[in-house]
């Protein structure tokens, strides 16, 4: 049985696309304040290949790309199979908590149309970054009992493709700064509404860029694969994580906080040192073999 030390009422996964770990070189006054409030790292790993569908698919489905089988073309043209053995967090919540409010705000529309399953009653919005966050802020005001909310901002990746990725590309760094402002507005609204006290927030990006190709990504080069990742909330330690972290691990802490039961072994793991000792148990129940999917260790 999974036990929680403190009740988490809602989970927010807030991401920007293609930022890598260049948030360290960009002006990010909001991340600079918020990341240290929880556990964080600038050395998390994106999945391979370091491409959006593969990576966001792993964030939301808890498994590596060879299992969820997503790529950009599939995500843009096909619905994710509703009977897949590797469901998204959204499908798991809907099946196990039928009345839960679910929302996905994604500037890159294939996340809503091809990575998250159809017909789950998820409130889905796809708009340019600034309009998207405006819509999200209205939604939060009116739906403070939302159970799971995902946000993807796209412009760092767009700027990287147009102007180049890296700390020598001012347009790219400026796009990261803009996304920092937008995510900061979400976090400040959550705090103003008093929602941070019983919410879990993950802050992340899916991949970087500029490794093998200044204007693209997809390789295992550190510029493509090394990314920032952070988690804030009840029972989460504060400070730098010293062990390995994968973006896929996002699903493990979300599932643990949401009280979900899995039917398949996940690749997602709880990063070492993430949870404080107020968590009574550090595992997620798997109904088919009764073993823990997310012990507080990471298998790399």
Task: Locate predicted features.
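Active-site nucleophile/metal-coordination loop of metallo-enzymes that catalyze phosphate/sulfate
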Residues: 5-10, 20-98
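Loop/turn elements at helix/coil->beta-strand transitions in domains of secreted/extracellular proteins
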Residues: 7-11, 37-41, 96-103, 144-149, ...
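Metal-dependent active-site segment of extracytoplasmic phospho-/sulfohydrolases and closely related
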Residues: 11-15, 30-31, 178-217, 254
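Second-shell loop/turn segments in exported
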Residues: 17-22, 45-46, 75-81, 123, ...
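Substrate-binding rim/cap in mid-to-C-terminal beta-strand-loop elements of soluble/periplasmic
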Residues: 56-60, 218-261
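A substrate-binding/cap region within the structured catalytic cores of diverse enzymes
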Residues: 80-135
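Active-site His/acidic residue clusters
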Residues: 109-123, 137-181, 185
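Polar, surface-exposed loop/tail segments
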Residues: 260-296
């Amino acid at each position: 049985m999974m036990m929680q030390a403190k009740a988490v009422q809602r989970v927010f996964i807030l991401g920007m696309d293609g930022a890598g770990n260049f948030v360290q070189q960009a002006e990010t006054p909001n991340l600079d304040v918020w990341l240290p409030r929880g556990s964080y790292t600038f050395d998390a790993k994106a999945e391979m290949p370091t491409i959006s569908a593969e990576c966001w698919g792993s964030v939301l489905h808890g498994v590596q790309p060879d299992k969820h089988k997503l790529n950009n073309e599939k995500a843009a043209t096909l619905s994710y199979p509703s009977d897949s053995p590797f469901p998204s967090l959204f499908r798991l919540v809907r099946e196990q908590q039928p009345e839960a409010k679910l929302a996905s705000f994604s500037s890159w529309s294939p996340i809503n149309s091809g990575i998250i399953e159809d017909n789950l009653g998820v409130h889905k919005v796809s708009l340019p970054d600034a309009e998207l966050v405006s819509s999200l802020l209205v939604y939060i005001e009116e739906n403070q009992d939302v159970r799971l909310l995902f946000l993807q901002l796209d412009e760092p990746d767009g700027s990287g493709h147009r102007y180049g990725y890296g700390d020598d590309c001012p347009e790219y760094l400026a796009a990261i700064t803009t996304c920092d402002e937008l995510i900061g507005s979400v976090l400040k609204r959550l705090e103003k509404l008093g929602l941070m006290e019983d919410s879990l927030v993950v802050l992340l990006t899916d991949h970087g860029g500029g490794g093998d190709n200044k204007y693209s990504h997809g390789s295992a080069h550190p510029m493509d694969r090394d990314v920032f990742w952070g988690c804030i909330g009840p029972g989460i330690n504060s400070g730098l994580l010293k062990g390995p972290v994968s973006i896929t691990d996002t699903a493990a802490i979300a599932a643990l906080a949401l009280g979900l039961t899995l039917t398949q072994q996940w690749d997602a793991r709880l990063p070492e040192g993430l949870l404080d000792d107020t968590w009574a148990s550090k595992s997620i129940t798997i109904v088919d073999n009764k073993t823990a999917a997310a012990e507080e260790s990471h298998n790399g």
